[in-house]
């Protein structure tokens, strides 16, 4: 039997240009031959093992141990590398878990199968049965006794040494990116682990997962511009939801004291490294809690998601270390401004005219609709966004938001003009937004009316008046706290991803010409 000696693959410095159209034509001809033979695209092979499981289980088994206790396996996956050596050949095959090497000889699989294998291409989906062993160079491999082609790849994969270098192509053809970029696969595995962790965390805290409408007759729950659509049967305009908040709070009115939803929101706004028109959030509401309880709970949730997704609460983002195990900081808006822009005095931050003048220096147009009747609190928030927000690298809760920019939050009993609201910032990005809920129907109705006035003045992000939600509050909602966490931004943090597109499988892009 041929001794399985693994070759050293040469890595050329210059990769010659290839004609993809010619390669595709050649592969289509191979597929035509397979169709004539009646063996194209079979579906009768069932794997018994996964590559990563075998690599882990037999990591410390040497050649002699494997020969003494032979293990028969059946594995299928994509052929990522093929080396034909004459009387023996190697193939690196990747399944959904990892990769493993196939060792193929005509003596083991038959000359006809071996000759057919020589014609197969990288990217083909192949399957093998055989015995696990270790090569002379120590690589865990499958000595194939049966070898089959399950699916013909008609398009060539990107060059293995350069990968998929076009960033937009990575997003547009995510299926190719997942094939050739291990880091991309790791990112989305971590995303799934984080979401699973969050669901378990919520269940362990006695929250009930629910589903609320995606199509809303009135957009609400956040300050954002909605997507609009038309319901033909009802002949009415509808809106893709910008947030599930008002429906979830209706459920609290109905007696479900702890509810949460993980789902998509849609906002018809700009696209950036932090924004995608379609994004995933968790929103949760708990009766008989307040914003202080929410901050503690949210901190624990994020910490546990990191541990479950990565195995640690200490992470690195863009070259800087973050310890999510440490208590999160808490600052008011003015404290944050003065921490990162200490030149501002308390008197200046309480002066509307000064704030408007200062905002102009940062290029903020104070004549915009949302600023026309803005008070000191809203102007302070705008200055915070210019001076401090991007500096909040360590996890920091910004608390005590002004009432005029918090139409759904409970007003403070201690300080006039502010609410029991927080936003959580990590690496200079907003990750979460929460508050003690406003459950006074008359106060809520008055705030909705102010929002309508702002909308009439030209503020497209101001809220509508939701009469049914007011009616729900009039039945009585218990005191409660609620919070929303951006799943995509959290996963960006956990996976060291600089753009939100890196953590969304199919982000929105301009249509191809």
From Swiss-Prot:
Keywords: Aminoacyl-tRNA synthetase, ATP-binding, Cytoplasm, Ligase, Magnesium, Metal-binding, Nucleotide-binding, Protein biosynthesis. Mg(2+) 1 binds at residues 423, 430. InterPro entries: Aa-tRNA-synt_II, aa-tRNA-synth_II, aa-tRNA-synth_II/BPL/LPL, Lys-tRNA-ligase_II, Lys-tRNA-ligase_II_N, Lys-tRNA-synth_II_C, NA-bd_OB-fold, NA-bd_OB_tRNA. Its cofactor is Mg(2+). One of its GO terms (biological process) is lysyl-tRNA aminoacylation. Binds 3 Mg(2+) ions per subunit. Its EC number is 6.1.1.6. Residues 1-22 are annotated as: Disordered. It comes from the Bacteria. Belongs to the class-II aminoacyl-tRNA synthetase family. This is Lysine--tRNA ligase. It comes from Paraburkholderia xenovorans (strain LB400). The lineage of its organism: Bacteria, Pseudomonadati, Pseudomonadota, Betaproteobacteria, Burkholderiales. The gene is lysS.
């Amino acid at each position: 039997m041929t001794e399985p000696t693994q070759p050293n693959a040469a890595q050329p410095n210059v990769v010659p240009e290839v004609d993809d159209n010619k390669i595709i034509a050649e592969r289509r001809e191979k597929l035509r031959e397979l169709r004539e033979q009646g063996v194209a695209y079979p579906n009768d092979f069932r794997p018994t093992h996964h590559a990563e499981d075998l690599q882990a289980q037999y990591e410390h088994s040497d050649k002699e141990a494997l020969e003494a206790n032979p293990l028969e396996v059946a594995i299928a996956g994509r052929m990522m590398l093929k080396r034909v050596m004459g009387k023996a050949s190697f193939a690196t095959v990747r399944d959904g878990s990892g990769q493993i090497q196939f060792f193929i000889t005509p003596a083991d699989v038959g000359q006809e199968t071996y000759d057919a294998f020589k014609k197969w291409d990288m990217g083909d989906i192949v399957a093998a049965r055989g015995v696990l062993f270790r090569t002379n160079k120590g690589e865990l491999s499958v000595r194939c006794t049966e070898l089959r082609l399950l699916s013909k790849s008609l398009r060539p994969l990107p060059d293995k040494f350069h990968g998929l270098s076009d960033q937009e192509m990575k997003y547009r053809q995510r299926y190719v990116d997942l094939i050739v970029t291990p880091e991309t696969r790791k990112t989305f595995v971590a995303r799934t682990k984080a979401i699973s962790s969050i669901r378990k965390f919520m269940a362990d805290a006695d929250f009930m997962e629910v589903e609320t409408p995606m199509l809303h007759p009135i957009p609400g729950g956040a300050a954002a511009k909605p997507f609009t659509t038309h319901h033909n049967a009802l002949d009415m305009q509808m809106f893709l939801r910008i947030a599930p908040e008002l429906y979830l709070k209706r459920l609290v009115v109905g007696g479900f004291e702890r509810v949460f939803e993980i789902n998509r929101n849609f906002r018809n706004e700009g696209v950036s490294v932090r924004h995608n028109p379609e994004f995933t959030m968790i929103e949760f509401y708990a009766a008989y809690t307040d914003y202080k309880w929410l901050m503690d709970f949210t901190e624990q949730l994020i910490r546990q998601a990191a541990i479950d997704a990565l195995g640690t609460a200490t992470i690195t983002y863009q070259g800087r270390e973050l310890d999510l195990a440490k208590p999160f900081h808490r600052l008011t808006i003015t404290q944050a401004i003065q921490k990162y822009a200490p030149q501002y005095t308390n008197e200046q931050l309480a002066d509307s005219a000064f704030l408007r003048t200062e905002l102009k220096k940062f290029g903020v147009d104070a004549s915009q609709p949302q600023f026309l009747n803005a008070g000191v609190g809203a102007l302070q928030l705008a200055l915070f966004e210019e001076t401090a927000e991007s500096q909040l690298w360590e996890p920091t809760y910004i608390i005590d938001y002004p009432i005029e920019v918090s139409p759904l939050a409970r007003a403070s009993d201690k300080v006039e003009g502010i609410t029991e609201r927080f936003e959580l910032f990590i690496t200079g990005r907003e990750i979460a937004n929460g508050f003690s809920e406003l459950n006074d129907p008359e106060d809520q109705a008055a705030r909705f009316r102010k929002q309508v006035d702002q909308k009439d003045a030209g503020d497209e992000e101001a809220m509508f008046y939701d009469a049914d939600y007011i009616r729900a509050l009039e039945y009585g909602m218990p005191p409660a706290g609620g919070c929303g966490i951006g799943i995509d931004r959290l996963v960006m943090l956990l996976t060291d991803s600089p753009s939100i597109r890196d953590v969304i499988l199919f982000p929105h892009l301009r249509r191809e010409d």
